[in-house]
Amino acid sequence: MIIRLMGVAALAIAAPAYAETQVIHAGRVITAAGSAPLGESTITVTDGRIVSVTPGRVPAPAGATEIDLSGKTVLPGLVDMHVHLSGDPGGDFWKEAVEPDEWGVVVGAKNALVTARAGFTTVRDLGSARDVGFVLRRGTAEGMIPGPRIISSGPAISIIGGHGDVSGFRPEVNAVLDAGNTCTGPEQCAARVREASKNGANVIKITATGGVLSQQGRGLGQHFTDPEMKAIADTAHGLGLRVAAHAHGARGIEGAARAGIDTIEHGTFADAAAIKAMKEKGTAYVPTLMAFTGIRDRLGKGVYTPTVEAKVRETLGTIGKALNAAHEAGVTIVFGTDAGVFEHGRNAEEFAQMVELGGMTPTEALASATTTAAKLLDMENEIGRIAPGYSADIIAVSGDPLADIRTLEKVDFVMVRGKRIP
């Protein structure tokens, strides 16, 4: 009897899983930014992957689930290259000292769903407490919580006392909250990269300059030395990881680019020399214009400390200038918002700012959140297009985002990895 049961179990394990097929009837399809849109089409999805994109309305096979989007424009799911899922906007920095890391998972699960509903099917989570981002990544990947595909850095690597290090509390409280993410000198900084990789990071985040929302008042200039940043970039690349650098000040931006950092986040005060370095080194720019909307909306309302407010005021006169200059210079622009500094779910408002302030066309803006972002994630054969073999990351909107980019601010349908987001 035992042998018979074991045989039945073996057959059950060996048997192929039932193939789930879904058929989407689309009124119009943007298969990729820059490609001519298709008219009425039928998209077939099996087990989370796109099998075919066929002109016209094709009858669904027996047993397939049909999804009627015949009045919609269907396009690839969007990518936000800079979010903080476990954070919500506000200035109560002291909560860092009283709330457990586990609470970040609860907040992150809420924000993962909100983000996916907004049409963002892949995000790069750049900075979270210890294992929070990694747990969220696993939760959405295994279908335990609804949300986007998550690329996570874990805690950002920073200098001692800089943006990303714990500050603003009594020394003994700072010590308890320390995430072990600071370094001094190339050797120690390389070790931090190796530790991050060991802990589960699939991207490295550093704070190359001072930051706006931290309690340190040392300005927004360069923090890491050039040799430290080169050690970080070289070590990460040797491990197959890309590096994102939070950077506001011009010299920090230039230094990060020349060190081989892959993406510059914010880039607020980028000057001609910094942009030249980015272009020469192939460093991409993630402008996060919505971050400035978030901090401007809260300025003077008692949300931020005086230290933070002084830095906020320093940045507001520059919004969009660096993006415009970088775009004109031919620097690769990648969509990213810094969601968490403003409310999650408003991510798509970044598109209009990229067009209106940055001089980009709607097609360029859409590419920055699809094909270009996919390439920077080394996932250009997985996401960013509606094509056979790609993950079924699909959204639908009413109207034409190539004519009015604000159309993307209201998404009517979202599918991530073949699963419809409720």
What do these predicted ranges mean?
Residues 72-144, 159-167, 227, 251, ...:
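Metal-associated gating/positioning segment near the N- to mid-region
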Residues 89-93, 133, 214-216, 253-259, ...:
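Histidine/acidic-residue-rich catalytic or RNA/ligand-binding cores of hydrolases
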Residues 98, 238, 242, 304-307, ...:
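His/Asp/Glu-enriched, well-ordered alpha-helical/loop segment
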